[in-house]
Amino acid sequence: MIRSGDWVTARLDGVAYLEKPPLVYWMMACSYKVFGVHDWAARLPLALFCIGVCLLTAAFGIWAFGKRAGFYAGLVMSTCVGLYLFTRVLIPDVILTFTITLSMWALLRVLEEDEPNPRAWAFVLAASLGTGLLLKSLIAVVFPAAAGFLYLLATRQLFSARTWKRLHPFTGLAIILLISVPWHVLATLRNPPYFSLSMHSGPGEYHGFLWFFFINEQLLRFLNLRYPRDYNTVPRIWFWLFHLIWLFPWSVYLPAVGKLSFKPVDRAGRVRLLALCWIGFILVFFTFSTTQEYYSMPAYPAMALLLGSAMIAESSWIKWGTRVLTVVASLCAAAVITLLVLDRNVATPGDIFNALTSHPGAYTLSLGHMEDLTLQSFAYLRMPLLLAAIAFLIGAIGTFAAKPKRAFFAAALMMVVFFQGARVALVTFDPYLSSRPLAEAILHEPDGKLIIDRFYYTYSSVAFYTNKPLLMLNGDVLNLSYGASAPDAPKVFLHDEQLKDVWAQPERYYLVTSHTQLPRLEKLLGRDKLNVVAFSGGKYVFTNQFLPNSTLPPEVAGTNTPEPGRDPASANSVSDLRIATPSGVHPDAPKAALAKPQIQRQTRYSL
C-alpha cells in the first residue's frame, strides 16, 4: 500500500487480494509510516489491541459486577491459552473481538435506566459495528446484532418503543454506513465487473470484487462451496471441547458459572444473560459452518466475564475447580519432566526440522503443525520444556489446598511462566515456520531476481525481509488464484516450462523451495544447474549461476547424474560439502545423513 499508494485494494506481490477488508492493513501501513518497515511495527497494532481487549473486558466486568470480578475477568482474558496462542499470527480476530466487546457493552449502557448519556453510547455501538465491518466484514455486525436480538427477546424489550428510541437506529445506521460504505464502493469501482449473482466458484473465474467479497467469501464459505478450498474445518465436537484448552487454566471453573443467576433483575444478571446470548450464538453459528479453532475468539470476553463473576462467589464449585487444576497441573508437570528425562541424551544436530514429521494436509488448521512433533523433536525444546515444568509445578504447588485468591494468583503466575516457555519454543521453531534465515542469506549474496516455488504464504517472509519483488512458480493457486485471474493481473507467475527458459538466462535468479520439491526440480532443470546457496528448516535457496561457496543439492534416488569435475555429494562424501551462510562458509555440516521422505539430508544451513 505504501509503495503503490493504493490504499483501496490490498495486494500480494502486486496481485489483488480481495478476501478481507483493509483496516488491519491500514493499521500496519500507518505503523510503518511512523516507525519504519519492521516486523515489530507490523505486529504493534495487534499487540496494542490484545492489551486493549483485556483492559476492556476488565472495565466491562468492573461496571457489571464490581472491582474484584472485573479484575478476575481481565485476568482470565489476559492469561488464557487461546488469546496468547491465536495472537502469534497476524490476523484481525483480536481487533474484531475488541469491537464486538465494545458494542456489547455499549448496548447495555444504552439500555441502562440510570445511564446519563445513552445517546453517546448508541453512537459508540454504531461506530464499533462500522469499524468491525472493515475488519472482518459481515460477521462483525451479525454476531453482536444476533446476540443483542436474543437478549432483547429474552428480556421482552425487542418490541419496546423506549428501547428503539434509546438505540437511535437511523442515526446509528448512518454512522455504520459512513464508516464502511466508502471503501466497499471504491473497491467495487476499482475491481470490476460490478455485479454478478453466480453461485458457482471455480478456477479461472473472475467476477470482480463485489461477487468475490460477499458471495464467495461470505455465503459460499459458510456453505463450504467456496473456491479455492484452501481451508479446513475442525470437527464439531472438538470445536466445542477445545474451549477447555483455550480458556485454560480458568476452564476448570466453568461448572461454577452454572450456579450463577441469569435473571435480568439487576445489572449483573443482565450482563450474564447477554454474555450467554453472545457465547451461544457464536458457538452455534460455527457449529453449522466451516470453522477454525480461533473463530470463537470474539466469545472469549463473554466467557471471561462469566468466569470473573463466578470466581468472586467462591462457591464449592470454585473449590472443586481448584482441586482439578492441582491435579491437571501435576499431571502436566509429570509429563513434561518425563519428556525431559527421555530426551536427555538425544542429539540435536542442525535445527528442529531434522526431528519433525510432515502432515501438510493439517496445516490449514491453526494447530496443524502440532502433528509434526516427534519424541526426538522435544530434545530441541529442552529450555521451553524446563520452563513449562517450572510453570506447572508453580500451578500444582500454589493451588494445592489453597484459598481462592491464592489459587487464582498461582494459576496466573503459572501461565506467565508457561508463556515464556512458549515464546522460547517459537524461537526454536523459527527456521521451520519462517523463511527469515533464507532471506538473510539471499541479502548476503550478489543481487538477482527472486522466485518462490508454489505457495506464496509458505515463503512470504522471504518477500518481507528481502524487500524484493517476486516471481511465483506455479503460485497462481489458493489465495492468489482469484487475483491471478483478473484481467489486469501482473505478470509475476511462472510455470515449470517457463522456469527452464528463465533458469538458462545469463541473469542471476534465486529460487526458494521446499526439500520435497527436489526430485521435481532435478528432473526439470538438472542437478548440476541447482547451486545451493542456503538451507534452513527444510527449505532451500538455489541459484542458476555458480557461486564460490555454493554446492550441489543432496542426491535424490533415481534423478541424479554427477556433474563432471564436481563432487556428487553422496552420503560418503558429505564432509566435503559446504553450505553458504550470511557470514560466509560454514564448514561444520553434520556428517550423518538424516533421512527425510525421498531425500537424504546431508547439508545444513545455520546461523
Language model regions located:
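Membrane-embedded architecture of ER/inner-membrane glycosylation machinery
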Residues: F123, A127, L260-P582, R604-L607
